[in-house]
């Protein structure tokens, strides 16, 4: 499973990129707004840091407007992927993007049927929202499994991005479910580094070494 970071914060991206684990980045209007910076400039800076798909979301709701809005985004860098909401207009836009050779990420996917429709429209990626499903008492990782099974049965090549990752168990569950990609907030990636036994082990090694060199 590949790892993307879900953020628009340049410093967070730079830090995690140095770990050698990043295959891409996802952003959304909320994350961009949080940074208080020019959208296109942020996307351009991200493409200079990470070599891989960079999802940039359109804010228009009509297919024709989405297609127009995306032109400035795809002009930034070939790795820019247009993020589109899972709606009828979104699917129309995905079809248009696919015909132009522009990659798309269909977001806000909450059912296997939505994932099937998105794939058939030509989506390069679909993003089932694991955490938000858990919030309403459904099992997000089970949706990922269902989508994978459907795609495998029908030979669909659309990649599945497990999104709305809230904690480290979500990341583990996404990997076990077989997601192609998990897009993970900075906080959860940092938490994934940690285990108390690791810290204890390092402390013991250092104490043992200090005792040896005295």
Curated annotation (Swiss-Prot):
Protein family membership: Belongs to the transaldolase family. Type 3B subfamily.
SUPFAM superfamilies hit by this protein: Aldolase (SSF51569)
- State which pathway it belongs to: Carbohydrate degradation; pentose phosphate pathway; D-glyceraldehyde 3-phosphate and beta-D-fructose 6-phosphate from D-ribose 5-phosphate and D-xylulose 5-phosphate (non-oxidative stage): step 2/3
| Catalytic residues of the enzyme | 83 (schiff-base intermediate with substrate)
Database matches in HAMAP family: Transaldolase_3b
Q: Which organism was this protein described from?
A: Alkaliphilus metalliredigens (strain QYMF)
Which reactions is this enzyme annotated as catalysing?
A: D-sedoheptulose 7-phosphate + D-glyceraldehyde 3-phosphate = D-erythrose 4-phosphate + beta-D-fructose 6-phosphate
Indicate whether RNA-binding appears among the record's keywords.
no
Q: What is the lineage of its organism?
A: Bacteria, Bacillati, Bacillota, Clostridia, Peptostreptococcales
Q: Which UniProt keywords apply?
A: Cytoplasm, Pentose shunt, Schiff base, Transferase
Kindly list the places in or outside the cell where this protein is found, as annotated in its UniProt entry.
Cytoplasm
* InterPro entries referenced in this protein's UniProt entry, alphabetically: Aldolase_TIM, TAL/FSA, Transaldolase_3B, Transaldolase_3B/F6P_aldolase, Transaldolase_AS, TSA/FSA_arc/bac
Query: Which EC number applies?
Result: 2.2.1.2
Give an example GO biological process.
carbohydrate metabolic process
Q: Which GO terms describe its molecular function?
A: aldehyde-lyase activity; transaldolase activity
Describe the function of this protein. Transaldolase is important for the balance of metabolites in the pentose-phosphate pathway.
Please tell me which top-level EC class this enzyme sits in: transferase
What's the encoding gene here? tal
Q: What is this protein called?
A: Probable transaldolase
Q: Which CDD domains match?
A: Transaldolase_FSA
Give the UniProt entry's GO cellular component terms. cytoplasm
Q: What is its main location?
A: cytoplasm
């Amino acid at each position: 499973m590949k790892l993307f970071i879900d953020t628009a914060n340049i410093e967070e991206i730079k830090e995690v990129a140095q770990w050698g684990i990043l295959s891409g980045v996802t952003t959304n209007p909320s994350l961009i707004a949080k940074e208080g910076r020019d959208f296109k400039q942020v996307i351009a800076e991200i493409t200079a840091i990470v070599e891989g798909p960079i999802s940039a979301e359109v804010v228009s709701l009509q297919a024709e407007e989405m297609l127009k809005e995306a032109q400035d985004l795809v002009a930034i860098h070939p790795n820019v992927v247009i993020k589109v909401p899972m709606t009828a207009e979104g699917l129309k836009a995905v079809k248009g993007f696919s015909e132009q050779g522009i990659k798309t990420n269909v977001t806000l996917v909450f059912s296997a049927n939505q994932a099937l429709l998105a794939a058939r429209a030509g989506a390069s990626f679909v993003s089932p929202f694991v955490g938000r499903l858990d919030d309403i008492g459904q099992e997000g990782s089970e949706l990922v499994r269902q989508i994978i099974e459907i795609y495998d049965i029908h030979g669909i090549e659309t990649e599945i991005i497990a999104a709305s990752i809230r904690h480290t168990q979500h990341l583990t569950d996404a990997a076990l479910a077989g997601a192609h990609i998990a897009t993970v907030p900075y906080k959860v990636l940092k938490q994934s580094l940690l285990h108390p036994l690791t810290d204890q082990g390092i402390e013991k090694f250092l104490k043992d070494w200090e005792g040896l060199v005295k």
